[in-house]
Design a protein with these regions (language model features):
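Short glycine-dipeptide loop
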Residues: 30
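A beta-strand edge to alpha-helix "cap/lid" segment located at domain peripheries
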Residues: 1-23, 33-119
């Protein structure tokens, strides 16, 4: 689990590259919200887990580079440039994300709001 807000997006990319939906879902609070590419929202961990399952089916290799991580108490605003590259000729996918993360009682950080295209 991320020990600082700046760690979370790199840990997400590692989970994506391992195709580990459960490791990815563990990065979210139970009632978190993720914005989907079509503008709809995945609300709550069950919907987020389904979203993540569809995401990892894309395959490829994800990298994520933080643009900033701004902490304020137990909350932080994080943004990153990310990309998924493919070896099968598909065009790479890129984006700029914006997330709100919250520090948990154990000191780790989890997503509260995740907007993969909101940066």
């Amino acid at each position: 689990m991320p020990s600082t807000p700046a760690d979370i997006n790199a840990i997400f990319a590692a989970g994506y590259n391992a195709r580990d939906v459960e490791a990815l879902a563990a990065l979210y609070e139970h009632d978190a919200v993720v914005t989907n590419p079509d503008g709809s929202m995945a609300v709550g961990i069950d919907a987020i887990r389904m979203h993540l399952g569809q995401l990892v089916e894309l395959g490829g290799f994800m990298t994520s580079h933080n643009r900033y991580a701004i902490p304020n108490g137990d909350l932080a605003l994080v943004a990153a440039d990310w990309e998924i590259e493919f070896t099968d000729g598909r065009e790479r996918i890129t984006g700029r994300s914006a997330e709100v993360v919250r520090q948990q009682l154990d000191g780790s950080w989890r997503y509260v709001l995740d907007h993969p295209g909101g940066g």
